[in-house]
Structure formats: C-alpha cells, structure tokens
Design a protein with these regions (language model features):
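Helix-loop "lid/cap" segments that line or gate small-molecule binding pockets
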Residues: 35-41
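Residues that flank catalytic or metal-binding motifs in active/ligand-binding sites
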Residues: 33, 45, 81, 118-120, ...
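C-terminal accessory segments of extracellular proteins
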Residues: 94-160
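Soluble or luminal CAZymes and related metallo-dependent hydrolases
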Residues: 25-33, 114, 121
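Conserved hydrophobic/amphipathic alpha-helical signal-anchor segments
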Residues: 1-31, 43-46, 131, 135, ...
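A Trp-anchored, charged/polar loop motif used as the substrate-binding/catalytic surface
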Residues: 30-34, 63-76, 109-111, 158-160
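Acidic, glycine-rich loop-and-strand cores that form catalytic or ligand-binding grooves
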Residues: 41-106
Length: 160
C-alpha cells in the first residue's frame, strides 16, 4: 500500500521531504514509522495487540500513539527481499527482558521471544505480505534468513 506509492520503499527508506522517516531511522521511536502510514490504516486500534497488557488501545489518531503501539518496525525490510520482516510483536529481545528502542541483532541465535505478550511466540509480518506465528527457534531461523539475504547485515528492529 504505502510502499506502492513510494517506489516500493518503506517509510524508513524514504526521506522526510518525500513523506518518509529515513532521517529518523536511527532513533528509538517506532511510532514515527507508523504515523506516516496512518492514511493507509482504518483505525489506530490495529496498532495495539489485544493481548498486550502494557498498551492502551485507542480509536483516535490524535491520542499519544506511543502508549498504544504493540509492534516493532523491521528496518531491514526491503521490497526486493520478500523474506525480510516488516513488523512484529514487540516481545523480541536479545535477552530475557523486553526492550524498547533500536535493537541491533548481530547474530540470529541471540534473538528470542520474551514472555511479556504471547508467552513463547511472536507474530511477524513479512514483506511478501504473509504473516506467521513464530516460536523462538523459528524466529531465529527467520532472522538468519533475513540476515543472509541482506549479505549478513545485522538485523535492526525499532521496538516501541
């Protein structure tokens, strides 16, 4: 949707002057990347996972979305690599605790699902339009596939 209108690029790949968030991709604010696609979404309610106990669901766009957002943005997502992760539940980390901000994963084996939302799994949306529920082993496999597709670059996620 949004990427179709921006030459197959996602917000973090498009300069601010063209309606994207590229200059902010290094910042720890996932909400910035979702706000720019708000015209493509019917309601901000879909930005909150119903099972996320630490987020407040809202029906209005002028509410503070940082307290509602349940999903990370996958900064490596790229239309030319359909196996890259576009978004997912925020309960991913390289430790046993949920983190916020920019998470850089150097080794796929370090990525794990925390127990804060879905106990032992994470929902992800891939660039190819598919979605998956991944257990920790499958999450690490998906990360390894993404990192290999991107010539072994670290995986970068902005977690709300």
């Amino acid at each position: 949707m949004w990427s179709n209108d921006h030459t197959e690029r996602f917000p973090w790949q498009v300069p601010v002057a063209e309606g994207g968030t590229k200059e902010f991709a290094h910042l720890p604010y996932a909400v910035l990347h979702y706000v720019v696609v708000s015209n493509e979404l019917n309601s901000p309610k879909i930005l909150t996972c119903p099972q996320d106990p630490n987020r407040i669901r809202t029906n209005v766009w002028d509410a503070p979305l940082h307290v509602s957002l349940s999903y990370f943005a996958g900064l490596n997502a790229d239309e030319t690599n359909p196996d890259t992760i576009l978004a997912g539940d925020r309960n991913v980390s390289t430790s046993s605790s949920t983190v916020t901000g920019l998470l850089t994963v150097q080794n796929a084996r370090d990525l794990q699902a925390t127990k804060d939302i879905h106990k032992t799994f994470v929902h992800v949306a891939l660039v190819d339009g598919s979605a998956a529920q991944l257990n920790p082993a499958d999450l690490r496999k998906a990360a390894a596939v993404e990192m290999k597709a991107l010539t072994n670059q670290p995986m970068r996620l902005v977690i709300p």
